[in-house]
Amino acid sequence: MERSAPVQASLWSARMVEWSLMAGVILVLALVFARKLQVVQGQGELAAVQSTLGALRTALVLEHLQKSTVGQGSSVAGTQRNPFELLDRMPANYRGEITRASASSAPPGSWLFDKDCVCVGYVPLYPKWFDSPSGNTVAWYRVSGAPGPLQLLAEEAYVWQDQALN
């Protein structure tokens, strides 16, 4: 009987080492998964931003083409208005007309329009992926263009996860 006690103690300590290693491996895998999930969320937001910018640009071109077929093509450059009004459906995260000064109070993930500068702005949902040369926390796109269709031009060289956001 004296020998069974040390064998049980060594089995118990070996079992604890196994479970500790298993818990460590699971913890490392969970941390790697959480990191990859954040990257994918950032990529999803980038895709949504690019899609909305594409829809706005397309709406501006279609408006120009429509006005040129009616014969109002020369006055298109003077009608710089909110491009969100040209969309069939407003984005769910569009917050309306907000000035640059109060843009920081908009909730993350919001689109906005500043009628004073005729600019479209986006407040990132995950700002850790967004980089602005000036350190601005909002991506601004100026509505401009003459002659021809109005365009959305990035005010800075924005970068999102090492990709140009223009």
What are these regions (language model features)?
Residues W12, A103-A106, L153:
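Intrinsically disordered, low-complexity regions enriched in Ser/Pro/Gly/Gln/His and often acidic
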Residues M1-Q41:
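N-terminal single-pass transmembrane signal-anchor helix
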Residues H64-Y126:
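Extracellular/periplasmic head regions of type IV pilus-like filament subunits
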Residues Q43-T69:
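Membrane-proximal N-terminal amphipathic helix
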Residues C119-N166:
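Short, surface-exposed interaction loops/tails
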